[in-house]
Amino acid sequence: MQIILASQSPRRQELLKRVVPTFTIAPADIDETVGKDGLPAEYVAQMAAQKAAAIAEQSPEALVIGCDTIVALAGEILGKPTSREDGYRMLRLLSGKTHDVYTSVTLKQGEKERSATVHSTVTFYPLTDTEIHAYLDTAEYADKAGAYGIQGQGALLIEAIAGDYYAIMGLPIAKVARLLKEFN
């Protein structure tokens, strides 16, 4: 069975290799701004499903894995920053607070579709401007929801997590492994 990961994220590719040794990459080109005013869990589930559907339409025999991760603070969705200034704004908002991280995954093959959303929380230390700018200087923030990556230098900003570390990183591998069993 051909498996396609509908993501260009190197982190997701690295994580999926722990579950599936062989797969191809086909990033989905969808509008990720649609529905951003909705509830975070609904938004992330919608994005993962749309990514899987877009690639499954092109490869109906393949098993497609679509995923999305967002950060939310008090219900406000923080996607990927559009600039260094936007990254600063996000990190300033997250400083000293606990926020939500939602990662949704959708597996689709033909008409069969299975989805799951994993909710975790992350607490940031109170951050100084110097700490924020030092992190922004690493450029890690650029392609990450909430402007940080837990697996890199962003770990230095984090006081505590509750939930699934791999989901915070971008792919809940234990959940994916269980969903894959439904397709074998």
Swiss-Prot record:
InterPro entries: ITPase-like_fam (IPR029001), Maf-like (IPR003697). Its EC number is 3.6.1.9. Keywords: Cytoplasm, Hydrolase, Nucleotide metabolism. It comes from the Bacteria. The record marks R11, T69, Q151 as: Important for substrate specificity. Its cofactor is a divalent metal cation. GO terms for biological process: nucleotide metabolic process. One of its GO terms (cellular component) is cytoplasm. It catalyses: dTTP + H2O = dTMP + diphosphate + H(+); UTP + H2O = UMP + diphosphate + H(+). It is found in: Cytoplasm. Its main location: cytoplasm. It holds the Pfam family Maf. One of its GO terms (molecular function) is dTTP diphosphatase activity. It is an enzyme of class 3 (hydrolase). NCBIfam families: maf. Belongs to the Maf family. YhdE subfamily. HAMAP family: Maf (MF_00528). PANTHER family: BIFUNCTIONAL DTTP/UTP PYROPHOSPHATASE/METHYLTRANSFERASE PROTEIN-RELATED, BIFUNCTIONAL DTTP_UTP PYROPHOSPHATASE_METHYLTRANSFERASE PROTEIN-RELATED. This is dTTP/UTP pyrophosphatase. The lineage of its organism: Bacteria, Bacillati, Bacillota, Bacilli, Lactobacillales.
